[in-house]
Amino acid sequence: MCLMTGIDSRARETSSLDIITHVAGQAVAASPRSAVAHMGQAMVLRAQGRFEEAIRAYDAVLTLNRNFVPAYANIAYAKLTAGSTEDTIPLVEQAIRASARDPTVGNWYDLIGEAHLLQSRTDEAIIWLERARSAIPTHAAIRAHLASAYALDGETQRAATELTEARKLSSNDRYTSLARLQAVVGYWGVPKLRALFEATYFAGLRKAGMPEE
């Protein structure tokens, strides 16, 4: 999992993305039966925002090895960003069933909570986001997701508390305003998903006390 995360990070940060893409393609060509090679290619494609291609690459990973647990959570993320919110939760639940003690399980809880939040299932979102907070109490984004969910559920004081924690825990000032958050993150998925963020996550943050500017 660390290797794949490293590939994803480098793909986002490097100025030589074409080289990484080429190397990932060469790895698949050299070892077409290697789940790891396909996983590396999928992570690069995801970092490029080529989510449909990334999903196909993740599918190849699971075709080769159904027990490659990181692929389930990563394909769920790719599907969510591509607008397939309904497909996200079963995939992450499968990852949790296969590896409940995974050190990144808190991120998986958060992803399920976020998917519920985007579909306006606020009560279920809160359940999963509270689990995520318990698993990773210092994760700023989880606190922000929970702030939004609490606010949408009418729990404004708890929402304000979580938003304050998100601001304290963040390594930058992204939670000072909606404009700053949107600028720092940059890409919020396909138009369908962006509309869901606006109707749920951003709306909740406004109710929690986050200003526009």
Residue ranges of model-derived segments:
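Alpha-helical protein-protein interaction modules
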Residues: 3-7, 12-15, 20-28, 34-37, ...
